[in-house]
Structure formats: structure tokens, C-alpha cells
């Protein structure tokens, strides 16, 4: 994971002029329900926590490095702090909240981070990106199934069949869907990814896209309006 963080940082710096002092610290965690998380503090510093109780493939670690750090959540938060301190960001734009109108933008950036780096060229990376889409589509459907009070055994069966995961991962996915806060957040991943990826492919990686995504605060509606002006 350290190696992929370094490679992602190198490639992200070709896209963004980042503060020289920005850093990411990698910490191993155990027994957490999450697979990984970026905890941004201040002064362009983040801690990326990785659940080492899970089984990881090297393409999944590449995706995690890009999603949580470069050019995903860490870079997004660092640019927002810079704009707050030196630009014209309002104070509330520097705050990150789960399951709010900014959520699809934040997770859409994270889920497309490998695309931004052009880390979508090998069969392994393309498979990882496809599995990510499958996972969040499955989570959205699981959230609807929970809302309909479908039995847990049906949730687990669907999670395994649709998400192509084993029993242990299906249990984690169902637990996620039964948490009301996180169930709503699944939609941020699914729809945020689609909105941003469609624009990225349309613009073929034009830097103007990154100016909109990273250097301006957006909700889904303001982002859609900004995309129409590009």
C-alpha cells in the first residue's frame, strides 16, 4: 500500500499543483466495519486507515491509494483547505459531511480517481473498476430491499449473487445497507461516479474538468450546472 500511495502521489502531482507540505500517513486497523478511510486533519495532512483484516489484491490496493488519497479524498480536502485559506471558499465549504448534497461529488471523485490517473489500462485495473461499480449498484439495491423489510437471508443471497462476493463480504455489505446513514450514502457512490465519469470521458481528461471539481465547492446541482458551462 505504501508503494501505491507513492506512485499515486507522483502521478497526481502531474495533474495538480499541491502544497509541498502535504502528506498522507498510512495506519493499519483491525476489526473495523470499513475497508479504508481518509481522515483529513489540517495543514494538508491526512491519515489513511486500511483494514488489514480483509483480504487485499494488489489492484484493490492501487484503487484504495487513489480513492482515499491521490487524487481522491486527501487531494480534494487539501485543495479545499488551500482555497479556504488563500482563495474565496466560504468556511462551510471546507467542511465534509456524510450523506449530504456534497456526498456524490466527494465519492464520485474518489471512485474515479484511478481514471484521473489513467490507471485503467491493465486488465486487472479495469476489473477492479468494474467490480467497484458492481459493488455500489448492489448496495443501492440492498438499501431498497432493506426499506421493503425483506428477510436477511434474501439480502445475503442477493449480495453474494449480484456483488460476486463471498459470505463474509456479503455480511459486511448487508450490515452497511441496514445502517440508515450509510445506506443513503450508497447512492452517493453510485450516482456521483456516473455523473463525473461521463463528463471525464466526454472531455477526455481536459484539465478544465479538475478546475471545476477540485477548486470550487459543489453540490450535485451546482456541479451539473458547471458541467453544462464547460
Functional labels for PLM-detected ranges:
Residues 49-66:
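Short pre-active-site segment immediately N-terminal to the catalytic Zn-binding motif
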Residues 77-125:
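Post-HExxH zinc-binding segment in Zn-dependent metallohydrolases
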Residues 1, 60, 94-101, 128-129, ...:
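Second-shell loop/turn segments in exported
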Residues 167-230:
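C-terminal, non-catalytic "cap/extension" segments appended to globular domains
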Residues 64, 68-77, 108:
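Catalytic glutamate of the conserved HExxH
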Residues 1-45:
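Contiguous, non-catalytic segments that form substrate-binding/exosite surfaces or channel walls
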Residues 2-3, 55, 65, 100-104, ...:
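Soluble non-cytosolic domains of exported or imported proteins
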Amino acid at each position: 500500500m505504501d508503494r501505491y500511495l507513492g506512485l499515486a502521489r507522483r502521478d497526481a502531482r502531474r495533474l495538480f499543483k499541491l502544497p509541498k507540505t502535504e502528506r498522507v500517513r498510512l495506519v493499519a486497523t483491525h476489526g473495523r466495519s470499513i475497508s479504508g478511510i481518509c481522515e483529513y486533519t489540517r495543514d494538508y495532512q491526512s491519515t489513511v486507515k486500511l483494514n488489514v483484516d480483509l483480504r487485499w489484491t494488489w489492484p484493490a490496493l492501487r484503487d484504495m491509494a487513489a480513492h482515499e488519497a491521490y487524487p481522491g479524498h486527501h487531494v480534494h480536502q487539501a485543495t479545499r483547505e488551500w482555497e479556504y485559506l488563500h482563495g474565496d471558499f466560504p468556511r462551510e465549504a471546507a467542511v465534509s459531511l456524510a450523506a449530504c448534497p456534497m456526498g456524490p461529488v466527494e465519492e464520485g471523485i474518489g471512485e474515479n480517481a484511478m481514471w484521473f490517473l489513467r490507471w485503467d489500462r491493465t486488465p486487472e485495473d479495469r476489473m477492479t473498476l468494474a467490480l467497484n461499480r458492481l459493488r455500489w449498484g448492489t448496495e443501492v439495491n440492498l438499501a431498497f430491499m432493506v426499506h421493503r423489510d425483506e428477510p436477511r437471508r434474501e439480502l445475503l443471497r442477493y449480495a453474494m449473487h449480484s456483488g460476486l462476493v463471498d459470505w463474509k463480504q456479503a455480511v459486511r455489505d448487508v450490515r452497511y445497507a441496514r445502517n440508515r446513514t450509510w445506506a443513503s450514502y450508497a447512492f452517493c457512490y453510485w450516482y456521483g461516479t456516473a455523473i463525473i465519469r461521463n463528463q471525464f470521458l466526454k472531455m477526455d481528461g481536459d484539465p478544465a474538468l479538475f478546475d471545476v471539481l477540485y477548486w470550487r465547492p459543489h453540490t450535485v446541482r451546482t456541479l451539473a450546472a458547471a458541467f453544462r458551462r464547460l
